[in-house]
């Protein structure tokens, strides 16, 4: 069965293909299509944004669509950047700009107050509009410098204390086993067959 992942983010596409592919699903993404809806993320939560995207794309394509909304919540910043994680430094800014702004905002924050979590809300929608939405998290803290080259987004700053490594220092399989997206996919997997009626 085909599932379309509603993203053009190559990093996310790779993670979804690895995880859903092993379950036997044919995974496509918006990178495989010339046209697709551009959903405005007007939700105030990760779950609301994920559902907006999956419902609109499922109606457009006539197939099951999986979308995510994910980001970083930093406790010392009252949960920011939150749903604005991708545009923390402004519209069309790079990961480097977002990471630089995060380090700037936390410059005077000691290590014990730099707790944070990655959050991923996944929403799988049928063309009928019915959705299945789950949430996964990965706890950690924000480091003082970027380390690692394997990830994307805030991964080089996100330290996992139990491993003493950043998310960007992990291999894809190591990250998938503990990541917020991996946790959300495990929850989704448990309900996927029933939801899709297979």
Swiss-Prot record:
Keywords linked to the UniProt accession: Hydrolase, Magnesium, Metal-binding, Nucleotide metabolism, Nucleotide-binding
Pfam families found in the cross-reference section: Ham1p_like (PF01725)
EC number: 3.6.1.66
Cofactor: Mg(2+)
Chain sites annotated for binding substrate: 7-12, 70, 152-155, 175, 180-181
Binding site for Mg(2+): 40, 69
Biological process according to GO: nucleotide metabolic process; purine nucleoside triphosphate catabolic process
Ranges in a coiled coil: none
Protein name from the UniProt record: dITP/XTP pyrophosphatase
Organism: Exiguobacterium sibiricum (strain DSM 17290 / CCUG 55495 / CIP 109462 / JCM 13490 / 255-15)
Lineage: Bacteria, Bacillati, Bacillota, Bacilli, Bacillales
